[in-house]
């Protein structure tokens, strides 16, 4: 691609389940689509999803599913978003994942789909591919996206900023027009050159922001780029205080935030203290199957009471299943660090896992900025309220990704802005090489600050300290960014500090504890 860039009908930024669904939906309508990803698609949150994807099980109904979602979300869910998911989701699972992509979901001896149960669900309704569901879904989607004649796949590119009118327009008269997204400035990670990707409609599907925390189940690429770009472009962002912490991530220095799926507890595993006591009984009737926020706080409190950096998840003593067969990925990962989970309990800690807030969208994925759609974790549909029910993230990505792709095509305008109408990327006259020591230390500051001051349990004083420290750092990072020779690391750092502040500001502004946002004061 030349520095002048390219033009397309629809630009999709990201290629997890939401981005891939959107790309296929738009391309199936006969439109040209560019899919932009900053790293190999195997680093998406979809790829790492173990537990499964919710649908409707036996003796189940949309109303029951919806009740579980609303209960987990502390009643702050958008009822219309819940209705869309429980009515459209099961149909799209069948039509796209099973019939079209052939995802090999686990089946029972009778050949029927095997349904698991997870925390917060009143029925067994979780489809899974053993414990590698996300990997199987992502591989199937990638094969379909890469082979589609109307989709151009750009891997190893970093989205720097969204292109908008009037902000990036050469035409001064454009300031009288309604703000509109026109695509994105994109950095070729190999050459470190920036190109304009002009699009008549743009769909953000960049995933979440767990990697702004010290402990996370997300890949390190999950720094919230989409939130930051949408915020700078003027799109409305909501509910950023609702950061869900997964209760059980493997506690081991070599584990890299490996997630121990809630399905493990669904199959009977119990949380126990380091001296062998079960403790979830005192935190509510659902015990180990309580919603994630309750379990995460219970573990956090138990760690404080026992002065231990972890608790134990005992699968071997309580689950009546063939552990290596049911959880092959978890079994192998634990074995690799010296744990035989058929005999030993698993040391676990809570970790930042999912953002329930994001770029506000309607039922079709439209944001408040014309020309911009969003789907998946980067979007806030209102579905999750204050806390997400287990195994609904993949389903939400599938539903809103498909809807956003179709809706973007229906809004395509004739003509559009030409690349010549938009400013070229400005390179500093004397760009400085990026010092990795500065990048690493700035990230350590962000992640430690967020974990200690804006984590599982928050107070006004902690959040005010986080705000002050992060604001100071943001000014330094912005100066660093303006003077540096552009590369993916400095772009990512700029996105990350912006997102950390968005979370902190939202948490400070909301004194009411609900779901994943817990204020001790």
Provide a role label for each language-model segment.
Residues 1-10, 28, 179, 189:
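Extreme N-terminal leader/targeting segments of oxidoreductases
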Residues 6-8, 25, 29-31, 40-43, ...:
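Glycine- and aromatic-enriched mobile tails/lids
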Residues 10-35:
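N-terminal Rossmann-like FAD-binding beta1-loop-alpha1 element of flavoenzymes
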Residues 39-70, 74, 244-247, 255-258:
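Conserved N-terminal glycine-rich FAD pyrophosphate-binding loop of Rossmann-like flavoproteins
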Residues 41, 229, 235-346, 407-416:
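An anion/pyrophosphate-binding glycine-rich loop and adjacent beta-alpha core
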Residues 79-90, 125-143, 154, 216-224, ...:
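Short beta-strand to alpha-helix junction loop
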Residues 97-193, 198, 205, 249-252:
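Conserved redox-cofactor binding core of oxidoreductases
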Residues 161-191, 339-383:
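FAD-site-proximal beta/loop scaffold in flavoenzymes
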